[in-house]
């Protein structure tokens, strides 16, 4: 499973996930060159890489995903983080992502959308 954490997530979460699973391919959109990408371009890039987006953007990202799907395009997969998980609660987010990765890390995530439970 390859993950991209969006700019709304603590970049330290990527390090925590890598410590938990040394072979997990995790990037943060805060890395140089990535933060400037528009959401549609980010989804296109992630589709090409087969990388799943983990995002807190529940306002505009669902519409971008829908637009891609309606155009017959795929995406790498999206995991939405609900607002009920506080932005400062990295520990809870790490726990929820850990549960999901353990349960479904080997699944095909192409064009799949998932909401983490709080």
Question: Model segments located where?
Answer:
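Acidic, metal-binding active-site segment of PIN/NYN-like and related structure-specific nucleases
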Residues: 39, 45-66
